[in-house]
Amino acid sequence: MASMRDIKRRRDSIQSTGQITKAMKLVSTVKLQKAKGKAESTKPYSDLMYETICNMLARSGNINHKYLQAGESERKAVITITANRGLAGGYNTNITKLITESGIPKEDIDIIAIGTKGRDYLARRGYNITDDCSDVINEPLYTDARDICDKLLERFADGQIGEISVSYTHLRAHETE
């Protein structure tokens, strides 16, 4: 049977763990709000861009452009955007699950990894990581996105890949996550 001292020590340990957990929750809430603010600030721009492209395609009729046609190759390039660290809930898992459960043989997929968690997970499962851009995840710039796109479009034009996809999730309200 535990002595009174052992019980008191265990109680103090549990209270201490509770305080640490509460502090971690506060820090994660602040980080989430900051990330959410950044994501929401780009939404009007991306919505208008999407609407503009849809209107242009609807009004222009049949467009014959090499980037709107299926490529010659069976290989597919997939840009995966995950976190560099864990503790992101199901975010990293959901992104990698999109790829692993896509039904496409892993031999036919080239992964462009943005974020170490997705890169490491997919590499362990035998996927071909052709590009690692994990260093851009913390402070992404337009030039970083352009460089990644330029490389992919060059590979598409050369016939090395026949399709380019992006695996991503949508930001929902915090209460529903």
Regions found by a protein language model. Name each.
Residues A173-E177:
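A short, hydrophobic C-terminal helix/tail in secreted or cell-surface proteins
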Residues A2-R172:
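Conserved loop-to-helix interface motifs that mediate assembly, gating, or partner/ligand docking
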